[in-house]
Regions:
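Acidic-aromatic/histidine active-site loop/patch
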Residues: 1-132, 181, 187, 191-197, ...
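Walker A/P-loop phosphate-binding motif and the immediately C-terminal alpha-helix
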Residues: 127-169, 173-176, 233, 240-241
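Phosphate-binding/switch loop-helix module in NTP-utilizing enzymes
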Residues: 216-263, 271
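Inter-motif core of Ras-like GTPase G domains
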Residues: 242, 259-288
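Conserved C-terminal guanine-recognition region of P-loop GTPase G domains, centered on the G4
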Residues: 271, 294-306
């Protein structure tokens, strides 16, 4: 293994300063001082590190986290007094003998250190050139992520599909599909891309298989981590995703260029990049007056920045509004002409079942939302 970097996750313990001094004196590179377990696992997934020096007090450290480290070929060394062999930790350094850390790092790792050497169970990379469908909506657009996951799950029944959570504000795809581990696929892939190391095998390690035809790249664990997705990362992620199959992107709500002189990208860059790479866009809005007002402004804005087809989805359509579909169509086309308009009915019971079970509406089944969205699939994925 060529990587020799060290990750440090000391959880604020006092021994961290001594450890840093020892490593600096030995000229052993510390790639990153990780703030939490999520940060550690995402950094390990980049393939740049060989060792992780951990505090026994690191929140969330368990057998699953240890397996993920070893799968990434990162050997964990715990500083502390607890016996953590039960979760797979075999290398320890007592706090009062922190000077032994270098010796433990230099010690040869046993052959059993990689517990899960098999390739990740995800869709294979092929010579395909899938289409990118970006699901977008203004602030407060109801059910944008639900529409995105449903479109992806419907498409996955017939064609390999990758669902990307690129929302820089409120990523929710992982939780809605029952992926509850703390590893961010987006952060792991972005760091690899930043280092020029994101290729087909490493991108496969960043994704999760949801069902036989659907992979997901989970989003940001917290909205303040958006700065770690640097310029060029999203286009590379989309390029590799196309090689797996069709791509559905759950994007953010704003296309405003919010960069400034202090940084190369703004928070909205993931959404801007996704729209720039899109083959078609699904614009989601609500059927009530506020939702329609926001939708029409977004539609006008999209028409100014991209020539690709924009398919409007009016979500949560219901009779209690007192409006006919033709009334809504006339209102929208007064401002800009979308490619198509699809009306999706309100189905609180079906959505509740989906969210509580951590499954897509396709898996839960029997929702009128599916029937409403199925005709849209042909329009966005097979327009010819």
């Amino acid at each position: 293994m060529g990587a020799d970097g060290i990750l440090l996750a000391a959880a604020g313990q006092a021994w961290e300063t001594n450890a840093l001094e020892l490593l600096a004196a030995a000229q052993r590179p510390v790639l990153k001082r990780c703030v939490d377990l999520t940060d550690l696992l995402a950094s390990a997934a980049t393939g740049q590190a060989a060792i992780a020096v951990l505090s026994e007090k690191l929140m969330g450290l368990d057998a699953d986290a240890v397996i993920r480290l070893k799968r990434a070929e990162v050997r964990p060394i715990v500083v502390g007094e607890q016996d953590l062999t039960g979760i797979g930790i075999t290398d320890f350094v007592p706090v009062d003998r922190i000077d032994e850390l270098l010796g433990q790092i230099e010690a040869s790792a046993p052959n059993t250190s990689v517990l899960d050497p098999e390739p990740p169970d995800v869709l294979p990379q092929t010579n395909a050139s899938g289409r990118v469908v970006v699901v977008h909506g203004a602030n407060g657009a109801p059910g944008r992520s639900l529409i995105g996951t449903t479109i992806a799950a419907l498409r996955a029944r017939d064609s390999p599909t990758v669902l990307l959570d690129l929302d820089p504000q409120a990523g929710s795809v992982a939780q809605s599909l029952g992926v509850l581990d703390e590893v961010s696929g987006l952060l792991a892939a972005a760091r690899l891309a930043n280092n020029g190391a994101l290729d087909s095998p490493s991108f496969a390690r960043c994704r999760r298989r949801i069902n036989p035809g659907l992979d997901v790249l989970t989003g940001l664990p917290r909205s303040d981590r958006w700065m770690e997705v640097r310029a060029g990362a999203v286009p590379r992620i989309l390029e590799l995703s196309r090689e797996v199959g069709d791509v559905v992107v759950d994007a953010g709500s704003s296309l405003e260029d919010d960069t400034d002189v202090s940084r190369s990208v703004g928070r909205n860059q993931t959404t801007i990049d996704a729209v720039a790479e899109a083959d078609s866009i699904v614009l989601v809005g609500g059927a009530e007056p506020v939702g329609l007002s926001r939708l029409t402004r977004s539609l006008v804005g999209l028409r100014e920045v991209t020539p690709v087809p924009v398919h409007v989805v009016i979500n949560r359509m219901r009779d209690s509004l007192g409006w006919k579909r033709s009334d809504i169509q006339d209102l929208i086309t007064t401002y800009a002409e979308p490619t198509t308009i699809t009306f999706v009915p309100l189905d609180l019971a079906g959505v509740d079942r989906s969210m509580v079970q951590g499954k897509s509406l396709v898996e839960v089944g029997n929702s009128p939302i599916l029937k409403a969205l199925e005709p849209l699939l042909t329009l966005v994925f097979d327009p010819s």
